[in-house]
Amino acid sequence: MAFYESIYILRADLTTEQVELVNKRFSDNVAATGGKVVRTELWGRRQLAYLVKKNVKGFYVFHILEGEGSMVHDLEAKLGIDEDVLKFQHVRIEDVSDKASPLAPCEEKGEEGKAEDAADELTTFGMADDDDLGDDDDTVEAGI
């Protein structure tokens, strides 16, 4: 059996009970196809990068699944016709990490190292840190 990361975005106007109902349907579909939900993370309501089905926000849900390729095919068919689901994506992964994903809420990550993790992520992605702000010493003037 293979492992898969599954993420889907739900309409932001859904209540907590409706989100739980969609997650229950998703888990039932996984179990019906012989798969297993290894981990679930609710990332919450977030701003979308662009309009998706006339929505500017969505509720992100992340799962790690174990199952066969046919399971993913069945899930895509069912998520594609679900009116509450805006977008979805499944990716096959080699191994499962015990660490929570970077977008997981802080409660799921644990108390230790939250600030350090956030700072590491910013520097990893080339974001400016305090000593870079306002420095113009490394700019090159274009002699026009």
UniProtKB/Swiss-Prot annotation:
Gene Ontology cellular-component terms listed: cytoplasm; ribonucleoprotein complex; ribosome
Biased composition (Basic and acidic residues): 106-117
Listed Gene3D superfamilies: 3.30.70.60
A Pfam match: Ribosomal_S6
InterPro entries for this protein: Ribosomal_bS6 (IPR000529), Ribosomal_bS6_sf (IPR035980), Ribosomal_S6_plastid/chlpt (IPR020814), Transl_elong_EF1B/ribsomal_bS6 (IPR014717)
Keyword Ribosomal protein among record annotations: yes
Molecular-function GO terms, alphabetical: small ribosomal subunit rRNA binding; structural constituent of ribosome
This protein's record includes keyword rRNA-binding: yes
Superkingdom of origin: Bacteria
Biased composition (Acidic residues): 128-144
Record's keyword terms, sorted: Ribonucleoprotein, Ribosomal protein, RNA-binding, rRNA-binding
Region called Disordered, residue ranges: 99-144
Signal peptide location: none
Annotated GO biological process: translation
Function summary: Binds together with bS18 to 16S ribosomal RNA.
PANTHER family according to UniProt: MITOCHONDRIAL 28S RIBOSOMAL PROTEIN S6, SMALL RIBOSOMAL SUBUNIT PROTEIN BS6M
Family: Belongs to the bacterial ribosomal protein bS6 family.
Stated name of the protein: Small ribosomal subunit protein bS6
Classification of source organism: Bacteria, Pseudomonadati, Pseudomonadota, Alphaproteobacteria, Magnetococcales
